[in-house]
Amino acid sequence: MAPETEVEGCAFCAIAQGRDRSVEVLCEDRDWVAFFPLKPATPGHTLVIPRRHVADLWKVDPPLGAELMAAVIRVGRAIDRALKPEGMNLISSAGEIAEQTMFHLHLHVVPRWHRDGFGKIWPIDDKFDDANLDDVADLIREECQTP
């Protein structure tokens, strides 16, 4: 099933279709829009979204995915040239457990500086038991055979 062009009530669809002018659009193209979120984590924190409604990254078709990655690179390079951050995060959450709150695909491009208040994005404690990592790798390798 192809993604819908627009979902009624989706705030990001309204931005993508140009109906919500309350956000600061930084750049855009035929397939995507880049803008500041309402509550940026750091100066320059930017969201890149597809114009077509897609719930998350794992539901995007490969051509649109390629367009979005090209957009992220373009936006990230612009942020890098303009703000000279010490680093950058690219974040995409899929599903409530991963803290997705807007169910329209969005990629966070977050410039980072020492002591920026953003904090660590990975757990500090080693809570993962990697005893069966070979089995997990085999399962993923098998599924990678399907596009």
List each language-model region with its residue ranges.
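HIT superfamily nucleotide-processing domains
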Residues: 1-147
